[in-house]
């Protein structure tokens, strides 16, 4: 069946993801291949000192993104979308959307970017003996309680952006377990909110005499593939005001961008992981069991089917590296050589592989902004060497490439060395891997693990949530999400894999020891360079 017939007969599946700067829709066929897409750019706004998106911006963004998809489908296939096999919604995780009994929002949506929750996160981490990050919904809620915000007593429902949109489209107050794990800790045995922590929280806030307890106001937790309701008539018109899109379509549990990223890179099985490396970076390793104790630099979330995931998030990755590459571009322009940025990156990155495995003693700190993992509230990009270090272009570029994943290594070394976590495969995606084979080899040395890069990983979260919508309707009886992805989606495609050599691993370890010893240099730069 060709694409036009697939669309017109309602066999296509739609995934929509709300990222922080772009809303993206992907339409896939029954074989899980993307056949069309649409997008819409949007921006958060700083209102009264807090980052937010208005409800109008959310619904306008959804309509515009879907209209762009419809237009592309019309142009490419001369077809109209009337009905779909299934729909999935995903969005950036965490943050705070609180509603009263009348379904009115009580304060403007507070996004994950807000860092006004330090006191709450700190107290809750101690109360639960579990690392609660600043951006989690429970940190936002507890900070509102500490700040004695009036609206708290009127809360009837608390959810994330994906949970809010799903609720409006279906009438169902539910959340996929991955997104839920960024609201409140999940017990990986029950695959639901941690009952002991729920009890502790309720007791801790009891003196406020709110009419609710925390379990009353959180969304119901659902696993991938579970029934999460259908698109209502109201919901269909919210997506497509033209009235073409029919209601009563199955909608899968809404998920967060971490979960859809795991799906898009086939990193759902225990002992697999994925790394995203661009302006910032993060790694997610799927664990066989919970960690022995909490670590401030490791966030615990889950896969969309409820396995525990250890996440290390770094604020800085490629920005400083890009600034150095731009310096070489300026030099080329100065001496009158035509500039092709892909060539500049390619030549410099590949030349880095000819450098010493320990970068000849050179160290770079790529801190454009602060870096919580290494305890810095602010950053100053810094390159440092001793007079007798081996200073040449290959070592210089290699040191800067190492720096781009250095903090990620420090966080993951805790997992691999202290917690003795084992990983069979890590899939990488993002701008760092655009030059074939270089960023991948550097990351393999950093994490002492084979690293795969897939062609499809660039499709990202909108494709990931479309795959979860496909799993809802197409899974076989008792077929796990990991098996479904292996058998129906990736079918043996692990992309190109690079395994590090012992010398590369040893070289990176030497570099990172020098890097850690030198951190006071970076702290001093922050103190004295304004």
For every predicted segment, state its role.
Residues 114:
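Carbohydrate-associated surface elements
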Residues 117:
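Gly/Ser-rich phosphate-binding catalytic loop and adjacent alpha/beta segment
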Residues 2-8, 14-15, 81, 122-135, ...:
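Active-site core segments that coordinate phosphate-bearing ligands/cofactors
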Residues 1-108, 123, 154, 215, ...:
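N-terminal glycine/serine-rich phosphate-binding loop of ATP-dependent small-molecule kinases
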Residues 53, 57-61, 139, 438, ...:
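A general alpha-helical scaffold signature found inside nucleotide-binding enzyme cores
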